[in-house]
Amino acid sequence: MKKLLLSLIAASLWTMQGTAQQQLPKVVDKNGNLMDMPTFDSPEVEHIARKRCGTFMESLSNSKNGQTRAVSTTPNYVPHEGTINIPVILVEFKDQKFSVNKPKEAFEQFFNGTTQADLGNGNQHNYGSVSQYFQAMSSNTFNPVFKVYGPVTLDQNETYYGGKNASGNDEKPNQLINDAIAKLQSSDEAIKDATVFCNGGTTVDCVYIIYAGLGQNIGGANTTVWAKTGSASGNTLVGKNIRWYSMASELSGMKTKDGSIMIAGVGVSCHEFSHALGLPDIYPSVGSSTGYAKNNQNMEYWDLMDGGEYTYNGGYCPTPYTAWEKEQLGWPVDIQTLDKNQSVTMPTSKEQGGTAYKIVNPSNSHEYFLLENIQKKGWNTHQYAYGLMVYHVNEPSNAINMWTKLNDNEGYPGMAIVPADGLCASADKQENKGSVEINGEKESYYIEQLRGDLFPGTFSRLETLNVTELSDDHYRPNWHWYKSGNSGYEKTNKALQNITYDTTTGTVAFNYIHDTTTGIKGIERMEATTKRIYTLDGRYVGTDFNALPHGIYIIGGKKIVK
């Protein structure tokens, strides 16, 4: 829900234009007050207001007006295999210009760069580009290429598109798309043929907008534009209908250590583009009885589609996709079901080709736990903790799409962390927004609470943890099955014992007990192997090699010719 921020005036926030010395704007903190722009990697960074996009989206009607994600039960999403082309328009407002140096070059690097050079606005702090993120998540089966245009300057002030009221129903994202395209097409960069952006079809799959200044979702006033994705129904590009739009802000509300304003982190753009691929938000929607501010109700920073878009100073190294999300998109991921007593060793993470494990409810195949090894590598390099991540999944019986609301039923989340320390804290709960002293320094209590979520709790700094067992007797929140109709909880009768994490090698190990009611029988040692078979383009084709036609397949990360 938008907060009415005491008549914040955009002109008072932004006076940097046309001055010899760049004047930095104020940003909005978690309590709705103005604060000085904090320095990157300082404890004050965590004070910036970072709001879920659903705070805005849920206040709008579920119509096909481009202002909601609930656009259809069977929408056609952006293709997520092969190479696709997406136009990006850099948009300035009448009263708000770009602040970063060389904006076109900066956002070409932001979206497509293979390296992140310092262009004067902390660009090098992004771990990689948006395209590199999706290449990594898809094991190189998906390669989005972004064509950057602009900047173009619109005739209206930012407030015209960002709105003013607390309900959020006066934002005009579709008008922003329409006006941006009109300005582009009247410029020297006018697109002559949009076929390249139809990616084999007859409709432009998605238009991406980067708008100047702050976003309301990350430090901006209630008059700024909110990062979002939705239906672009009614908009066209060179005679081609546009299916989706995504948009995000230029800035993230921080300054570099030498005082320069910083370009945004790639996290929000990765999150928004993932909606155009069909993935839903994982956090609870504000329109539900749950709202945001509930502990142990979702994934928080452990999922890009939750708070993970803001990992590392506001999203400069966003959290990788979970195994669940990779499977939803049909991207290569090895998930093996645990169905007997065994000793499990997980030497590598799924990002490095390792195995994730599934424990299935014997009474409901749509309900299960997923187990992943989170290591300090790749897009997890700046994560808050490492070790065994356990999360509870309870899928709806129908197909997942971008408007699916997994976590709107309080106490019965559809996808939520099983925290080693007993608390997966909500970033939106007031009691979690404060600071705590660690080694003589004030740190974010919320971030410190995240450090205890992964087993065995090695990285917790709030308390010394070594949680070596997860079972009905050694219970943690979300470690249970749901009774029919979400009428209560049932014991799992499963157990993970002797959980370890080797901080040198990054190896996770544990003993799995399949049925605790029958006592502990022999433990069969199980190394991380895979039987899942994929085509060269990343399509999963089952586990029976003999049943497949002649061709080249990928099994366990290796090419096999039949």
Q: Model segments located where?
A:
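Bacterial Sec-dependent N-terminal signal peptides
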Residues: 1-23
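Propeptide-to-catalytic entry region of secreted or membrane-anchored zinc metalloproteases
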Residues: 21-269, 280-290, 298, 393, ...
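A short beta-strand micro-motif
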Residues: 27, 359-361, 532-535
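Extracellular hydrolytic enzyme modules, especially secreted metalloproteases
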Residues: 206-385, 394-396
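Hydrophobic, well-ordered secondary-structure elements that form the walls
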Residues: 371, 498, 538
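Short, surface-exposed, low-complexity cationic segments
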Residues: 378-390, 547-557
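C-terminal outer-membrane/trafficking sorting elements
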Residues: 518-562
